Amino acid sequence: MNPVNPLRTAVITGSSSGIGLELTRQLLKDQWKIIALNRSAFPADDRVIQSALSSGQLRSIQANFTNYASLRSALDQIRSQTDSIDVLFNNAGGSTSTLQHSDQGRELHFELQTVVPYIIYRELYESLRQGRMKTVVNTSSTAFRMLKAFDLDTLERPASFKKLFGPYAASKLALSLWTAEAASKAMADGIRLLSVDPGGNNTLRSNKTSGLPFYIKPVMKLFFSHPSRGASLLHDAVLGSVKHDSGAFLVNNKAARLRFHEQGSTILQRVHEIYEQNYLNT
């Protein structure tokens, strides 16, 4: 006998704090089954999270996202734990205070926030095809609206560094560009791709060096929303009353125009090249 209303399954990256943690709480409340892929462990004093871990409704896998051996091991674990995925939330990210590089030698924001979400999407593609909702939500940002120029060479090898409005913003734009570019091909298999700006959220943590400009911090503390607001925007992109077209970039749950959209094919070609030549052959 088939179960009535079986649990839907979501994979959420970057869910041990901030927006991702709030999204995890929301989906647990809605009776989703969640596989969390994080660099850090969940808070030990969060009773809701720890209860879900104990019951098996929430499963936690840890990995260094920008180390391909570590990432591959984690994705293998996910595939071994579920045959189908309803929604993939590519939420892991962050902004650094200095220019840094990944284990593969690429600028860290580009690796973590542009390339790795594509790798995760490709590696979980067959599981998404088997899901009922077949949706990918990539967490983006409107920070890229401040960019005056954008190109692939600068994205991979920036000559200078600027907090928030430099490599961070460029990598989020590139994420939304490949999302839009890959959407039509994915729809042939019924998979819908979205990139979503979660808005301004107070995600400051006292134990972490901030990649924000100094003048943003007091504004964030005073005026930015609790991370549950951003989590709700990610949640509603999939489960809200409006069904958005695949490839859309959403701001306040409405489709918005992407700048530099003519470079989408170049960005998609590059991340796919990295996936095939670097990730698959590592």
Label every PLM stretch briefly.
Residues 30-45:
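Conserved glycine-rich Rossmann-like NAD(P)H-binding loop of the short-chain dehydrogenase/reductase
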Residues 16-17:
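Conserved glycine-rich cofactor-binding loop
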Residues 52-69:
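Rossmann-fold cofactor-recognition segment
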